[in-house]
């Protein structure tokens, strides 16, 4: 008799694979084209002129940078498919009526999506190693590094997408949470620095963003680097191979570890998630005010500054921006964002009377921000 307390359910796993195979097939086809097919095409085209350095660069560049692109998008697609039952009341009730624990449902669904991605990457790069065998590439420093990089990236992006699926009961809200979450913190830092630089004496808003690592795709692409290995012959240097830098591998490993922590958080959330929250924009009552005021603040900072520049700023000379005008535009944008969030949560346009108190809080905070900036309270 099957144990109902197992953390993995084979029957559920097979059922999930049946629903996942079209996406899995498309994902596999892309990887096969990018690695073994492209490698074979290059070898055939150059007919002996294709060096080991060329092959190592193709493998590493595809695994590292191609992996960022594919994992970013397909991690979301696999998460949406694996946890699609959380966005349909009938499916949610059906899953939660199964004689298994929530942990079993979560881990089985999570591992299904992860298995599809990691198994595809494994097979693809093993085929790539077979195609490049005549060039005698180092397996671990080239193929292994490229394959490992792609796997680490897949773990992070997929785990973050799963967390986004936990936070909402609307299938179309998950991509919004996912894309915004991947750029939110450094984006807001940049906008706030720009805002402060316009009105605080002696403060430059054009310094580098300190929290860029919290935008994983934008941080990984330039920071994860491929190093060239050169050999000197007759006073000339030739690139003989490429390898993944140790620092680059540690960056990807750190993101993958963060992904596992994120997956654990998603599991803890799933254990307490109520079935009746299916269909809600925000799946947890405690997160509702965070969502409302977060949307209001982000809209105020982003859209408000754009609105001021569009209406007034482009006609002002450098250094003559109006703080009251900027705050007014930010307050207007913040109120739009707040009521838009209220409409999404309540699923109704009739939110203005009930949301008046929250709107007043948003406007008040932004006015206080303007007062603080005018007196330069930060020193």
Task: Kindly give the residue locations of the regions a language model identified.
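Long, hydrophobic alpha-helical segments
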Residues: 62-91
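Terminal transmembrane helical anchor/hairpin motif
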Residues: 3-5, 42-59, 183-269, 273-283, ...
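Aromatic- and glycine-rich beta-strand/loop motifs that create alpha-glucan
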Residues: 1-28
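Alpha-helical transmembrane segments of polytopic membrane proteins
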Residues: 65-66, 143-154, 247-258, 322-335, ...
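Helix-loop-helix units of permease transmembrane domains in multi-pass membrane transporters
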Residues: 82-115, 278-279
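Secretory targeting signals
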Residues: 57, 111-173, 186-189
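Cytoplasmic membrane-interface regions of multi-pass membrane proteins
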Residues: 7, 91-92, 170-172, 267-285, ...
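Internal/C-terminal transmembrane anchor helices
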Residues: 295-298, 341-378
């Amino acid at each position: 008799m099957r144990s109902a307390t197992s953390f993995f359910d084979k029957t559920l796993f097979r059922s999930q694979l049946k629903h996942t195979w079209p996406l899995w097939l498309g994902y596999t086809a892309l990887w096969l084209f990018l690695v073994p097919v492209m490698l074979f095409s290059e070898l055939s085209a150059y007919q002996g002129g294709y060096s080991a350095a060329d092959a190592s660069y193709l493998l590493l560049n595809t695994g590292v940078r191609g992996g960022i692109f594919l994992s970013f998008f397909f991690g979301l697609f696999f998460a949406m498919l694996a946890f699609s039952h959380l966005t349909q009341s009938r499916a949610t009730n059906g899953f939660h009526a199964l004689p298994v624990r929530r942990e079993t449902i979560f881990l089985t669904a999570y591992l299904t999506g992860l298995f599809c991605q990691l198994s595809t990457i494994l097979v693809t790069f093993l085929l790539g190693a077979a195609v490049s065998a005549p060039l005698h590439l180092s397996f671990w420093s080239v193929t292994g590094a490229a394959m490992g990089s792609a796997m680490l990236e897949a773990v992070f992006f997929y785990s973050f997408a799963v967390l986004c699926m936990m936070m909402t009961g609307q299938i179309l809200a998950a991509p919004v949470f996912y894309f915004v979450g991947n750029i939110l913190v450094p984006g807001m830092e940049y906008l706030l620095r720009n805002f402060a630089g316009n009105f605080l004496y002696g403060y430059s808003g054009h310094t580098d963003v300190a929290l860029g690592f919290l935008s994983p795709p934008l941080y990984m692409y330039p920071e994860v680097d491929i190093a060239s290995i050169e050999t000197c012959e007759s006073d000339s240097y030739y690139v003989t191979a490429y390898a993944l830098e140790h620092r680059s591998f540690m960056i990807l490993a750190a993101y993958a570890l963060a992904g596992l922590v994120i997956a654990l958080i998603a599991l803890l959330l799933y254990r307490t998630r109520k079935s009746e929250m299916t269909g809600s924009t925000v799946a947890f009552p405690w997160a509702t005010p965070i969502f409302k005021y977060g949307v209001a603040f982000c809209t105020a900072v982003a859209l408000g500054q754009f609105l001021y520049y569009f209406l007034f700023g482009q006609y002002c000379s450098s250094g003559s921006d109006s703080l009251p005008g900027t705050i007014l535009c930010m307050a207007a944008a913040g109120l739009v964002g707040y009521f838009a969030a209220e409409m999404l949560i309540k699923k109704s346009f009739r939110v203005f009377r009930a949301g008046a108190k929250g709107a007043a809080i948003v406007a008040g905070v932004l006015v206080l921000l303007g007062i603080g900036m005018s007196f330069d309270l930060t020193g």
